[in-house]
Amino acid sequence: MKSSIGDKTEQLNESTMLAAGHHSECLELSCELSELERIREYIFQLPLDSGKKKKIFLACEEIFANIVNYSGADWIQFYYDSRETEVHVIFSDNGKMFNPLESKNEKEFEDFDAGGMGISLVKELCSDIHYSNTDGKNILSMEFSEK
């Protein structure tokens, strides 16, 4: 799993995703946990194998819940892009700036509480993950490749 922060590497963000001409979709979401159902419905209707859908949803569920519970955002955008062997998911929000990739508090499995397994789990599920804050928007992109 690779990860990067800011502009240290070329970022796949919503504008480059859309400009690249790949199949992409965007859901405009309220900052409410009930909106997670829309993400779930969207992911599980995709033409992917069941295991990959579960993996993508688990990572998305963790990121979305963190945005809703801690960011103070008014809105969240969920972008999805699929290519031959990889899927890209991007969350964009207008909440307070927070880079989850800089989290130094890595927990051991036994230490996880009912609140979830956090960014550690997301990093394990993704083949690549990037964060940037541009024009007051948090942008977290995750790549899921065939392994």
Descriptions of predicted regions:
Residues 51-76:
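Conserved ATP-binding N-box helix of the HATPase_c
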